[in-house]
Amino acid sequence: MSSKCDVVVVGGGISGMAAAKLLHDSGLNVIVLEARDRVGGRTYTVRNQQVKYVDLGGSYVGPTQNRILRLSKELGLETYKVNEVERLIHYVKGKSYPFRGPLPPVRNPITFLDLNNLWRTVDDMGREIPSDAPWKAPLAEQWDQMTMKELLDKLCWTESSKQLATLFVNLCVTAETHEVSALWFLWYVKQCGGTTRIISTTNGGQERKFVGGSGQVTERIKDLLGDRVKLERPVVHIDQTGENVLVETLNHEVYEAKYVISAIPPVLGMKIHFSPPLPMMRNQLITRVPLGSVIKCIVYYKEPFWRHKDYCGSMIIEGEEAPIAYTLDDSKPDGSCAAIIGFILAHKARKLARLTKEERLKKLCDLYAKVLGSKEALNPVHYEEKNWCEEQYSAGCYTTYFPPGIMTQYGRVLRQPVGRIYFAGTETATHWSGYMEGAVEAGERAAREILHAMGKIPEDEIWQSEPESVDVPAKPITTTFLERHLPSVPGLLRLIGLTAIFSATALGYLAHKRGLLVRV
């Protein structure tokens, strides 16, 4: 006996729940099937006496992320700003350098030129890539055959620049530079608003968090949908051979629907049997796009001692020996539950996963004591962590990445419906893909695709722009005249070379005119 509905949504993360809410609000009968014993997907808010609440998964929102801001406001949630009042720290080669702004200042003029050219070039290349179709970029094939390591080797002339750029890639996509396609990474940064927007706290992707935790987004939608959300229901079979679509779960329940939305990471499609089989390109796509590797770590202290030293808690930490590459203050908005959140990224996550939780905590505290110059870092009162690599219904975090050669070959089928199955998930977004914002965009777009298929809305209403948030307005990202026009290192060398040639020629001419050159 099967349960009948209009639409089955596979996956109760933000994307699936946003899709379900829109369909429900449109008058459709929708059922959400979630594999875990909770909703939220890659967002996960834990609550206990020591921390009140803590986001162990996706957490940050900021300017230009207007869909998640609109949805959360509709659900009654509020945001607060992540602390960045005091100074940040750049830790490199065993020394701490305090600074203010999104990126650490550079003291070596050659390194400054090198980094300035790198950020400028990454943004310039991104502008050539269509957000909705990166495979259509003029040089898509060439860039997709290149790893980010190869691109950085071409662009960076100094080792300092290359190391900071590598950290930037690790932090943005939780993968190594040799693992990801240059085309895909350039697209990823572009659709997040560029290098400054994606990395910044103030006026950037990490500006805010939700009071009470991001897990409330899906929890409150679940409250609205009631028993239409079914937990602990991993989907194992989707059958489109009949008049309606039959969706079977691991516990042998069958749900019958007119349409299905798959709101899970593409690779998790391999856990589902499809009848008829998936088309060739979709079938191969889902075997080729892994997720990144990250362990999210939150260390709690008696008080935010770093603020007493005029540090805000944000640290950019270079070096292979450092377990953490990036931190932020994770204290509550009222100052309680003082905490520093850090990210163990990419290969370091895989390496340090072998240690015990206690061993990881000790490494973190030792590192923070060095970077902050304070033994108070050695005295935590509590510790929370989440290794997303071991989650069988996520397969990693933050998001899916594309290795070289995959985007141009398979990217165009990422959002392409398969019969009556439509695809959501943050990976399918065109703006802030990889973030909660992208999850909302994708879920609502997939829902409107079904509304269009049912004849309820015209095709031109499937994709909709979003008005800017009144509560979290965006400031434009600006660059100085020098940042726009300073030469790269090779440009400077060419300039010096041309200047030397011109000077030598001029001196030779003057010497000749004055009879100083003697013919031998």
UniProtKB/Swiss-Prot annotation:
Cytoplasmic topology ranges: 2-489
S-8alpha-FAD cysteine: residues bearing it: C397
A GO MF term: monoamine oxidase activity
Superkingdom: Eukaryota
TM region(s), chain numbering: 490-516
Subcellular location: Mitochondrion outer membrane
Classification via InterPro entries: Amino_oxidase, FAD/NAD-bd_sf, Flavin_amine_oxidase, Flavin_MAO
E.C. code: 1.4.3.21, 1.4.3.4
Residues recorded with modification N6-acetyllysine: K52
Name of this protein: Amine oxidase [flavin-containing] B
UniProt organism field: Sus scrofa (Pig)
Lineage: Eukaryota, Metazoa, Chordata, Craniata, Vertebrata
